[in-house]
Amino acid sequence: MSVELDVFRMIDVVADRVQNRPPLDKNLEKAIEVCRDIVYDESAADCCTYDAYHIPGKEKYPVLLYIHGGGFVAGDKSYRRGVSKWYAAKGIYVFNVNYGLCPKYRYPEPLAHLVTAMNKIADSAGELRLDLDKFFVSGDSAGAYYASMLIAACNYKRVQNKLGVAPKIKIKAAVLDCGLYDIAKTVSDKMMLDINCRVFRSFTGMENSDFEAYEHKELCKPIKYVNRDYPPTLVIYSKKDVLCGGQAERLIEAFKSYGVYYESYASETFAANHCFPLMWKGKDAEAANKLTTDFVDRFIAGKLPRHASRIKPCADAGAELSMEKTELEKKKSLAKKPVFPKLRERLAAKTRRPQR
């Protein structure tokens, strides 16, 4: 068994009890129906399954595709049953998805699996009363990487061509938790046990020193696919992250460059580290999850801006709301304002000659 597999499996096993006890009303939790192990791709039925969570009785459901983490080599939807219930209790139809793990399934095959999962959900929309105009994605760690690459698959034909499959639906919003958004940076970082190099080897079948020769290197950098069409996104991250340090900051810079509407929460303590919101308790976890609830509620209500448009003060100390104006918008707004009206009146009076 590989070191990287041991590490990421241990994280799930050790944290399982805590991560799967979200703060839920007991009656709501009992009302949630779970349909497990639905196969969405018969060609890889050993791994391509999802669990569906919902509370019966709604006419239409917002839809969430949740993608677990695990360093690309480990993880399972069963370890994300808590967060799936947490979202389902909000009236959302949640699809908690498994996908092919490396090295059995080399990248980008797992990404193609996830596009197929999206398409299965699209095909089930009528039967399950899903509102695909309120379809969003979320994931933690490697799951956040895949979530951001699904957005790239929605927005770029060349990504679809690489995968051999195109999404049938558009992603309307995203919640990204402590993700990886630039593998090129990660392979050059120094990490304990060389965990990044080991994961890259499982992910691609190559050594990290050979990254430039990797056939699919263009699909390893989600930040490269940020553009004006990127959906509103909540980015949650830890400034002391031992696995994905500096990754969210790079994504946010890309958002700023393209005027993407985003909100973010950053923990600043070492204790609130990688994927801290899944721990539920503690100042940072509670604040991040409160912001997530607010963000998702506004998304469902249709109250999130499609693009960044203006600067507002932060709602609380942990949340950074980015709504920047473009230079063009600034010029337009200035053009509409009267410039020094009193001075203009004085100049007009001086040039006015008395009639004879």
Sequence positions of predicted segments:
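Alpha/beta-hydrolase superfamily serine-hydrolase fold, recognizing
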Residues: 1-347
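Non-Sec secretion/translocation targeting segments of pathogen effectors
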Residues: 353-356
